[in-house]
Amino acid sequence: PTGLPPEAGSGGHAGAPPDVARRFGPDGATGVRLNTAIRGGGTAVHDEKAKLGLASVGLDWRSRDVRLSGDLGYQDNRLERTRSNVTLAPGVTSVPTPPDPASNFAQPWPFSNERDLFGTLRGEWDITPAATAWAAYGLRRSKEENSLANLTVSDATSSAGTVARFDNTRKDKVDTGELGLRGKLRTGGIGHEWVAAANWFRLDLRTAFAFDFANSLPNNLYNPTFHPRPDFSAATFVGGALDTPTRTGLTRLTSYAVGDTLSLANDRLLLTLGLRHQKLDIGSFAAGTGAVQSEYSASRTSPAVGATWKATRQLSIYANYIEGLTQGQTAPPPSGAAPLANAAQALAPFVSRQKEAGVKYEADGIGAGAAVFSTSRPRAFVDASQLFSAAGEDRHDGLELTVYGTPTRGLKLLGGATWLRAEQRSTGSAATDGRRVIGVPEFQATVGAEWEVPAVTGLALDARIVHTGSRYADDANTLKVPGWNRLDIGARYLTEIAGRLLTLRGRVDNVTDRAYWASVGGFPGAGYLVVGAPRTFTLSASVDF
C-alpha cells in the first residue's frame, strides 16, 4: 500500500510524510519501500521551533531458502529555542513549582542541528529445514552541533537563576556486525532450539565543547530575561576546536555466544542455557589534545539461565538470570553549572546482573502478568572536587504488573504498574547510603483503553492515564519532586472514499494542561528537571492506495 498522511499539530507544526511500498516479480519476490517525511513549524511551547527531514529506502528479495534485505536512511533534525532543563544550584533547599507548561524560559539563540546517515544489510539462508545461517551489518554516521543555555536556579521561591553559553559539536561513527547459526533438533524426547552467534561493535566518538561558566547571565524560571548571544569570555572552559572535534572515545566490543532452549516434559518445561564471551576495549581521550585519560581492556564469560513452566494452557511461570560485561559511564563536560575535572573520561567496565521471575496468564482474550526483578550497576556521581567517579552501587528491586486484552467486543485494554525500590548502596557516605536513586519513582502506572463506538462504524475512541510518583533530585534525598498524573485522549475514524481507505486520527495529550516536572536526572549523579509538555493537539490523515 501507499500511505499519504498529512499531519498538523499545536503551534503550527505540520508535515506530510508519504510512505510507499510495493512488491514486484514472480510471487512478489522483490520489495521496495520508500519513506520520506518533512515536518516543521512551531510547537505547543511558545517560540519553540522544530524541523525534521527524513528519507529512507528499503529493498528486500526472497526465495524459498534465501532472504536478503537492505535499508538506507538520512535524517536532518533541527531545533530552535528549545526549552532547556533546569539545574538546582548547590544550597537550594526545595524544588521550585513547575512553570506554565507552554511557557518558554529559553534564550532566543539556543539551537541544535543533528544529521544522521544510517543503514543495515541482512541475509538469511535456510541451509536445511531445521537450520538457518544469517549475517548482518549496520552503520550510523552522525553529526551534531548545538548552542545551549541551561537554566541554573539559585532561589527556589523566586526561581531566579542564571544561564551560561555552552556549545558542543559531535561526530560519531558506529559499525556493527553479526554472524550466526540457529536451528532445531530433537534428542530422544528432548527438543532443542539452539543458536551460535558472533557480534562486533565499534564506536569512534569525536567531540568538542566550550562552556563559559564564568560569564553567567541572569534569568528566571517564571519571568525570564532574554539576552543577545554572548561572545565567549577568556575564562571559557574549552575542550578542542568546535569546527574540528577530535577523538574523545573509542569503544570496541566483540562477543561470542551459544545457547540452547531445551523442551522437556512434553514441551511443558522450557530450559534455556547460554554462555557469552565478551571482550571490551575502551579508550577515552582529552578533547583537543588527544591525551589518554583512561584505557580499559576487559573480557569475561558470562552465563544466561532461564526456565519456563507451562502449568496449564493458560498459565506460565518463568525465571531467568543474565550477566554481561558493560561499558562504564562517561563524564559529561559540566555538572551543576561547573566544569568537571575529568570531562569525557570513561569509568571502568563492570559486570551487570539481572534476575527476574514471574507468571503470565492468557485466556478468553485477556492477558495478565506479574514479575519481580532485580538489577545492579556501579553508582556514578560527581564528588566535591568536581571529579566524576564511582562508589558503591545503584540497586533496583521491583514488582511489575501488566494487563491487556479485549474483555468485551469492541473494547481493548492495556495497562501496567511498577513498584520500584531503587537504593544507593555502599556509597561510603552516611548522607547517601540507603537513599533512593535520583529520579526514580517508587510507583508508576499507565492505563489505556480503546472503544469502538457501536453506533458509528469505523469510529474508535481512546484514553490513557499516566501516573508517576514522587522522585528526588539529589543523592541525599533532600529535594523531593512531586508526582504527577496526565490524561491523554484520542480518536480514529476509518472510512472509504472512491474505493480508497481513509484514516483520520486526532489526539490531545495532557488534556488538563497540567504543569509538572516530567523527568528528573539525566547523566549519573545529576538531578536536573525537565518541564512536561503542555496540552498538545495532533491531527493526521492517511490514504492507502
Regions found by a protein language model. Name each.
Residues 28-30, 65-68, 130-133, 189, ...:
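Repeated loop/turn-to-beta-strand initiation elements of outer-membrane beta-barrel proteins
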